[in-house]
Amino acid sequence: MEGCVSNIMICNLAYSGKLDELKERILADKSLATRTDQDSRTALHWACSAGHTEIVEFLLQLGVPVNDKDDAGWSPLHIAASAGRDEIVKALLVKGAHVNAVNQNGCTPLHYAASKNRHEIAVMLLEGGANPDAKDHYDATAMHRAAAKGNLKMVHILLFYKASTNIQDTEGNTPLHLACDEERVEEAKFLVTQGASIYIENKEEKTPLQVAKGGLGLILKRLAESEEASM
């Protein structure tokens, strides 16, 4: 069938947005609502992926579990946050989706909202109790992702919710190291004004200033000095 993503028909219907047929089949056999496919995904996972809000709402009204994970550890909330499905994220949170759930990579939904630049979703997750400093298996936080990707507004959002600027990942890099390495000039400047240290060394014994390219290092040094002088 068209939109065939799964070896389970009900999952394909959820992904394709075929609400009436999905309803008909599930009302005839309730067990289909929680049937898992070859990836341990349910109809809810697939509806979240494709952004079919009405199907998600129907499944949630039936009381399907909201926190079941697929074989890569992704919950429906991970999928909806990564795909930018604002209304679905809201519905899942109302039903008690675990906001700090981690997948096989140690990532929370907030990690994906930060790297994909999903502002509204990040705010919903943080308002719902997401840990702004949650670390993945590489000890990277949402701030590392936002800084590396050049998502300035996301950096602002994370700082508003008290995210740390100086956490080091497994390579010893802070968000400022990554911003400098990726030449994210505005993000790097803003991080320095918000307390990001220019002195922390990574595993290569380099500070953010030593990682910075062009004239960025000098700009950040002057910025940090003026911040220190005003304290």
UniProtKB/Swiss-Prot annotation:
One of its GO terms (cellular component) is proteasome regulatory particle, base subcomplex. Keywords: ANK repeat, Apoptosis, Chaperone, Cytoplasm, Nucleus, Repeat. Acts as a chaperone during the assembly of the 26S proteasome, specifically of the PA700/19S regulatory complex (RC). In the initial step of the base subcomplex assembly is part of an intermediate PSMD10:PSMC4:PSMC5:PAAF1 module which probably assembles with a PSMD5:PSMC2:PSMC1:PSMD2 module. Independently of the proteasome, regulates EGF-induced AKT activation through inhibition of the RHOA/ROCK/PTEN pathway, leading to prolonged AKT activation. Plays an important role in RAS-induced tumorigenesis. Acts as an oncoprotein by being involved in negative regulation of tumor suppressors RB1 and p53/TP53. Overexpression is leading to phosphorylation of RB1 and proteasomal degradation of RB1. Regulates CDK4-mediated phosphorylation of RB1 by competing with CDKN2A for binding with CDK4. Facilitates binding of MDM2 to p53/TP53 and the mono- and polyubiquitination of p53/TP53 by MDM2 suggesting a function in targeting the TP53:MDM2 complex to the 26S proteasome. Involved in p53-independent apoptosis. Involved in regulation of NF-kappa-B by retaining it in the cytoplasm. Induction: Up-regulated by activated HRAS. Part of transient complex containing PSMD10, PSMC4, PSMC5 and PAAF1 formed during the assembly of the 26S proteasome. Stays associated throughout the assembly of the PA700/19S RC and is released upon association with the 20S core. Interacts with PSMC4. Interacts with RB1. Interacts with CDK4. Interacts with MDM2. Interacts with RELA. Associates with a CDK4:CCND2 serine/threonine kinase complex. Interacts with ARHGDIA and increases the interaction between ARHGDIA and RHOA, hence promotes ARHGDIA inactivation of RHOA and ROCK. GO terms for biological process: apoptotic process; negative regulation of apoptotic process; negative regulation of DNA damage response, signal transduction by p53 class mediator; negative regulation of MAPK cascade; negative regulation of NF-kappaB transcription factor activity; negative regulation of release of cytochrome c from mitochondria; negative regulation of transcription by RNA polymerase II; positive regulation of cell growth. Its main location: cytoplasm. InterPro entries: Ank_repeat_dom-contain_49 (IPR051637), Ankyrin_rpt (IPR002110), Ankyrin_rpt-contain_sf (IPR036770). The keyword Endoplasmic reticulum does not apply. It is found in: Cytoplasm; Nucleus. Pfam families: Ank, Ank_2. ANK repeats lie at residues 3-36, 37-69, 70-102, 103-135, 136-168, 169-201, 202-226. This is 26S proteasome non-ATPase regulatory subunit 10. Gene3D superfamilies: Ankyrin repeat-containing domain. The gene is Psmd10.
